[in-house]
Amino acid sequence: MKKPISILFDSYHLYHLPQFEPLIDLLSNDKRFDIYHSTSRDIKDEEYELCSKILKKKPGSFIFSDSEEKRKKVIRNLNLDVFICGWSRYKLEDFVSDKTLVGMIYHGIGVKPSYWLDNNDRLDLRFVEGDYRINQLRENGICLLYTSDAADE
């Protein structure tokens, strides 16, 4: 069997976690993936503790550190195949190597201006749902490519 695909879900904030949980659970049942999770050290202590408590119970390995600088180094040293984030307002390039595929899963309901204003050149993929969100991104100059016919239904 070839080496599993390493994928980290970076729940920078607690509110990113609900978008990640179904994927974490799904991929954890597939031997082709090594699952990792993490959350920022730059958030409030209460939020960090709550998010950490949830992530430690999820399948896979919880990556943590006592500082954000150390967390960056630990994650970067994993030399991940895939890095999934919930927003791009931080230096993604500090967490990943050049070979890492970086994806962002949009969170919440509705469309937020941050979808097209918070662009990070290190993002390779954006996961969105629904024609309305896709059209909003296109209207604001974000180049999109469908990955599923589901958006056309």
Feature locations, PLM:
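A short, active-site helix/loop in glycosyltransferases that binds the activated sugar's phosphate group
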Residues: 128-144
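A short acidic (Asp/Glu
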Residues: 18-21, 46-50, 94-96, 115, ...
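Short beta-alpha junction loops
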Residues: 39-45, 108-109, 131-132
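N-terminal pre-catalytic "stem/leader" segment of glycosyltransferase-like enzymes
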Residues: 1-76
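Conserved small/polar residues in nucleotide/adenosyl-binding loops
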Residues: 146-151
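A short beta-strand/loop micro-motif in the catalytic core of glycosyltransferases
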Residues: 84, 124-130
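Extended catalytic core of nucleotide-activated donor transferases of GT-like folds
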Residues: 49-119
